Amino acid sequence: MKPTLISVLVIIFILRGTRAQRVTQPEKLLSVFKGAPVELKCNYSYSGSPELFWYVQYSRQRLQLLLRHISRESIKGFTADLNKGETSFHLKKPFAQEEDSAMYYCALS
């Protein structure tokens, strides 16, 4: 079985007013086998009430919104739950597919 390559890029700093915000994604590159579960980690620091997003960019395509923390939907099999206690917004999918190969961006506003 050929591994599916899932790339992760970090959007590091966004500033609003005087409060500094930051998102971090520990994995810069992630390879998983087709059919295997995948989890892309996103941790954040923010002193207010965060709005978190996952964006995806497929090869030769524009950046598109995948998920927002308020939607609680499953899009293309992906889900993400906002955990304020752990300050995380991890993107998960139970079974990776070849078409999931893309760049994934976690963003904070």
Swiss-Prot record:
Please give the SMART domains that the UniProt record associates with this protein.
IGv (SM00406)
Q: Where is the signal peptide?
A: 1-20
| Keywords recorded for this protein, A-Z | Adaptive immunity, Cell membrane, Disulfide bond, Glycoprotein, Immunity, Immunoglobulin domain, Membrane, Receptor, Signal, T cell receptor
Localization in the cell: Cell membrane
Which superkingdom? Answer: Eukaryota
> Which positions are glycosylated?
43
PROSITE patterns with a match to the protein in the record? IG_LIKE
Q: Where is the Ig-like domain?
A: 21-109
Which Gene Ontology cellular component annotation is one that this UniProt entry carries? Answer: T cell receptor complex
Example GO BP: adaptive immune response
- Which cysteines are cross-linked by disulfides? 42-106
What Pfam families does the entry give? V-set
Complexes and interactors: Alpha-beta TR is a heterodimer composed of an alpha and beta chain; disulfide-linked. The alpha-beta TR is associated with the transmembrane signaling CD3 coreceptor proteins to form the TR-CD3 (TcR or TCR). The assembly of alpha-beta TR heterodimers with CD3 occurs in the endoplasmic reticulum where a single alpha-beta TR heterodimer associates with one CD3D-CD3E heterodimer, one CD3G-CD3E heterodimer and one CD247 homodimer forming a stable octameric structure. CD3D-CD3E and CD3G-CD3E heterodimers preferentially associate with TR alpha and TR beta chains, respectively.
Q: Which PANTHER family match?
A: T CELL RECEPTOR ALPHA VARIABLE 16 (PTHR19367:SF18), T-CELL RECEPTOR ALPHA CHAIN V REGION (PTHR19367)
Functional description taken from the UniProt entry:
V region of the variable domain of T cell receptor (TR) alpha chain that participates in the antigen recognition. Alpha-beta T cell receptors are antigen specific receptors which are essential to the immune response and are present on the cell surface of T lymphocytes. Recognize peptide-major histocompatibility (MH) (pMH) complexes that are displayed by antigen presenting cells (APC), a prerequisite for efficient T cell adaptive immunity against pathogens.
Question: In its UniProt entry, what is this protein called?
Answer: T cell receptor alpha variable 16
> What gene is this protein a product of?
TRAV16
